[in-house]
Amino acid sequence: VRRQRQMCIRDRYYAEKVRKQNYALDEEMLRPYFSLENVRGGIFFLANRLYGITFRPIVVPLYNPECEAYEVLDADETHLGVLYFDFFPRQGKGGGAWCGYFREQRYRDGEREAPVVGIVANFTRPTATAPALLSLDETETLFHEFGHALHFLFHDVKYRGLSEVEGDFVELPSQIMENWATEPQVLAEYAVHYRTKEVIPEQLVRKIRNSALFNQGFATTELVAAALSDMDIHSIRRYEPFNPEAFEDNALRLQRGLIPQIEPRY
C-alpha cells in the first residue's frame, strides 16, 4: 500500500529547501550580510534620513549587562527620549521580539517628560569567530519593532492617557519601517558582509525581492485563522468557563476546515 506523508508547511527546514530550489536563495546565504551591528546601524541611518533624528550611546543603569542604551535626539538636538536594546536570550526571559516602554511621554509642570522605550529580542549570540548574524526575517523584525519604538519616542501629548491610538493603527508605523528593510537603497547602506566588507550584491537583492511572497499562502491563512478565532471568542454570549484550546479547535478545524498542518498561531 502506497502511503503519502504530509509535510508540515511550518517546518522551516524544508521550507528553506523549497525556497532554495525555487529561487536559488536560502537563509544562510544572507546571514553574513546582516550582522546585528550593521542592522542596528541601518535602522539608525534610516531614522536619520527620514526624520532627522540621531542616536547617541549613553551610560545609564541597565537591568542586564548585555543591554544597550541610546539617547535619541531630534533634528535640533533636543532630547526626545531613551531607547534600550535587549537583544539576546537568557534564562527566564520571554521568547520572541517586542517593543514596550518603561515610561510614557507626558508633560509634568509644563515640562516634557521624555519616554523611555525598549526593544527586546532573542537573536543568536555572537561566537568566537563571528558576530551575531541575523536572518532576513529577524532583520525585518528589528525594523518592525523599531517602528513601534519611533511611535513611542515621537509622542507629544499633555496627558499620557491620551497617547494611545486606535487598535487598527498600532501596527502601521512598524509595518512602514519593516518595508524599508529590503529597499535596495537602504540595503546598500547597511547590508555589508561581515568578513569581506562587500555590500550585498544586486543579484542577491533581486532574489530577495523575487522570493518576497514565498510561503505567504501559509502565513496569510495562519493570520486569518487567528483573526477568526479572536472574533469567535469575543462573540460568546454566555460567559461561562470553557476550554480555550477545545473551543479554538472546534471553531477552526471542525467548523471551518483548517488543515492540521497549520497550527493555531496563539
Label the model's feature ranges.
Residues 1-9:
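Single conserved hydrophobic/aromatic residue that forms the stacking wall/gate
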Residues 30, 36, 205-266:
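Pan-zinc metallopeptidase signature
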Residues 63-64, 71-140, 257-265:
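Active-site-adjacent "gating/activation" loops or surface patches in catalytic cores
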Residues 10-35, 180:
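Short His/Asp/Glu-rich catalytic/ion-coordination signatures at enzyme active sites or charged loops
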Residues 73, 79-82, 155-231:
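Acidic/histidine-rich catalytic neighborhood
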Residues 35-54:
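Zn2+-dependent metallopeptidase catalytic core
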Residues 54-67:
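Long, charged, glycine-rich C-terminal linkers/tails
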Residues 125, 133-153, 174:
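Active-site recognition of the HExxH zinc-binding catalytic motif
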